[in-house]
């Protein structure tokens, strides 16, 4: 488990989600131990005793949005209820402990508060101290919970600023500092993409082209999927490492497996016949039906799906008043766009998204799913798909800060 702790510590630093000197992993072997000796070990040992877990992460977020959201909540509330897709899938809601509740309390009382929160949810916010996230079986699960809280509080806070403005003293100053640090275009220089069609590159020495491709030529497709998956994580276009990616060679969809890490796809790519003639798709991404629908309805060969945050925020910004639809991510039937890109509703997996995305993506090769993320496609290879995703997220980031200035007067 020591190797896993080192691995996920590095991922937190890469993601810019946790303050470096605040990262504390705790693990249960015969006894609870930690990656660094600290004053919290005794308390979290008691937390382990109250829960059925093997790992726990305690760290401060690099952005203050979680604490600000707690302060913006009405007195008496103890949960944040974001509406983005990742929260609904992984957390449902986020319990929190207000600073005034734990400040001055004994560590025994704080332990009781933490256990109460974590018996119901995988992670919780302790205002002024940090986020605590659990792993029932693995360190990775604790990392995912922490990363999801960073993602969802980022999305919820910035969306709330657009809709409700600033509510707290010094909130505008904090926002301006965030804007200076984050309103910049990611550096995409140095990214290398294999020109497509990849199956032609892979089988260029074979005539006639066999079906399916033999193992060695397939490796070019696998290698490119792995590389582009890493790019997607490294450039911050996902939360933690979730998303999915696929390539279609005319008969077979090569797609990342469900719950796989986009930055570690080696050995986790499934070849799935598009006609459904095998059971290979059983471990494939839950969004395989959406990828299949795109390939059946368009000339695209490469599809990339990520969760860029500013695109998600603007997809959820709606000025419709007195709308009777509450479950917008599933039921909204309005035709909406942001920065010229269509926004669609639909559940993941075999739900409405498998119908809405293929139709929406057909013309431009890109669309945004409400509260969820971007689907981008390329006709021959992943270069266009990746660059479309980056371009849309950049435009949404610029539009977000334009709207924030317009609505709040921020400069």
Region locations from a protein language model:
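Glycine-rich flexible loops
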Residues: 1-411
């Amino acid at each position: 488990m020591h190797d896993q702790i080192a691995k996920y510590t590095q991922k937190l630093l890469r993601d810019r989600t946790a303050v470096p000197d605040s990262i504390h992993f705790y693990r249960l072997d015969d006894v609870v131990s930690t990656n660094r000796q600290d004053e919290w070990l005794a308390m979290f040992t008691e937390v382990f005793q109250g829960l059925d877990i093997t790992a726990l992460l305690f760290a401060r977020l690099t952005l203050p949005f979680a604490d600000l959201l707690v302060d913006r909540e009405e007195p008496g509330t103890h949960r944040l209820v974001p509406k983005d897709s990742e929260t609904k899938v992984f957390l449902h809601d986020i319990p929190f402990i207000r600073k005034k509740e734990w400040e001055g309390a004994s560590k025994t009382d704080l332990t009781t508060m933490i256990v109460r929160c974590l018996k119901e949810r995988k992670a919780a916010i302790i205002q002024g101290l940090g986020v605590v996230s659990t792993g029932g079986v693995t360190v990775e699960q604790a990392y995912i919970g922490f990363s999801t809280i960073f993602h969802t509080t980022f999305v919820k806070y910035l969306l709330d600023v657009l809709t409700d403005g600033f509510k707290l003293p010094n909130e505008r100053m904090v926002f301006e500092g965030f804007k200076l640090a984050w309103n910049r275009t990611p550096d995409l220089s140095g990214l290398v993409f294999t020109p497509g069609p990849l199956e032609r590159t892979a089988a260029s020495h074979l005539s006639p082209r066999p079906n399916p491709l033999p193992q060695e030529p397939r490796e070019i497709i696998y290698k490119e999927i792995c590389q582009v998956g890493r790019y997607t994580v490294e450039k911050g276009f996902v939360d933690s490492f979730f998303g999915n990616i696929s390539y279609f060679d005319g008969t077979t969809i090569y797609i990342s497996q469900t719950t796989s890490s986009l930055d570690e796809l080696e050995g986790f790519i499934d070849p799935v016949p598009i006609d459904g003639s095998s059971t290979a798709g059983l471990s494939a991404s839950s969004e395989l039906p959406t990828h299949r629908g795109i390939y059946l309805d368009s000339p695209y060969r490469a599809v990339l799906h990520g969760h860029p945050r500013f695109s998600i925020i603007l997809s959820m910004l709606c000025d419709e008043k007195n709308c009777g639809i509450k479950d917008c991510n599933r039921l909204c039937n309005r035709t909406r766009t942001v920065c010229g890109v269509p926004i669609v509703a639909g559940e993941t997996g075999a739900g409405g998204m498998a119908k809405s995305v293929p139709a929406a993506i057909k013309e431009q090769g890109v669309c945004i799913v409400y509260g969820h993320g971007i689907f981008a496609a390329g006709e021959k290879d992943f270069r266009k798909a990746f660059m479309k995703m980056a371009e849309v997220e950049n435009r949404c980031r610029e539009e977000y800060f334009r709207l924030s200035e317009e609505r709040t007067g921020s400069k």
